[in-house]
Amino acid sequence: DVDNPFKKNRPPIKPRGGKKTQPVPPPQSHETIPRLDEIYIHCMIKQAIHNKQHLLSGLMALQCITSERPNVVYSKTGVANWKLRAGMPIGCVVNIKGPPMYTFVDKLVEIVLPRLKEWYGVPLSSGDGNGNIAMGFPSSALSLFPEVEGNYDSFPLMTGFDVIFNTTAYTDHEARALLSGFQIPFNEKKRKRRNIRVME
């Protein structure tokens, strides 16, 4: 309403909700086929809060399975319950692209995933809405890589790690279709129906 004095010289009200507007996907063509752009692998080592030497196991393990040199991750804020202060090293991260990226995916799909126990696939809710898929693995998965399994005694500490697949897809549906082409399974968790008894 233009005649409303309360709206005069004021910016329009933003839509409700904290979600940002998604970019408009381009028209479907052979040039806009989603592809795998890069992979981030990171792990957090809580034992490094008390002893920084525990970071060496994570750094060596990530370098062995990716053939790339990882970087140390430092905490941005402090947590009193964990005795963690800002600026302390707590983990490591590595970014891989190109041929090392596809080599890592091949080892993950062909060697690690078939040997994981009680792992039923990546949940469908693992996307961020922009075509990036994240998945977490326990510490037992790290020891299944051939580079780590052959030198298991050289790694005093095994830790879990997270893998983030960055794709050029605009939606999670396209990203899941892309990763399923790499034989990465997805699991749709079905809710159990509760038996409701009707009182007569």
Regions found by a protein language model. Name each.
Residues D1-Q53:
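N-terminal, positively charged regions that mediate nucleic acid binding
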Residues V2-K7, P25-H30, I49, E68-Y74, ...:
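Active-site phosphate-binding and catalytic loops of NTP-dependent enzymes
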Residues S29-A48, Y74-V94:
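Short, charge-patterned binding micro-sites
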Residues L36, L56-N81:
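A glycine-rich, hydrophobic loop/mini-helix early in the fold
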Residues A48-L56, G98-T103, A169-H173:
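Ordered, soluble secondary-structure elements with a strong preference for glycine-centered loop motifs
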Residues I65-T66, I111-W119, F182-K189:
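A common structural junction motif
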Residues R69, N81-I164:
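Long, charge-patterned amphipathic alpha-helical coiled-coil/hairpin "stalk" segments used as oligomerization
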Residues F155-E200:
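An acidic, glycine-/histidine-flanked metal-binding catalytic module
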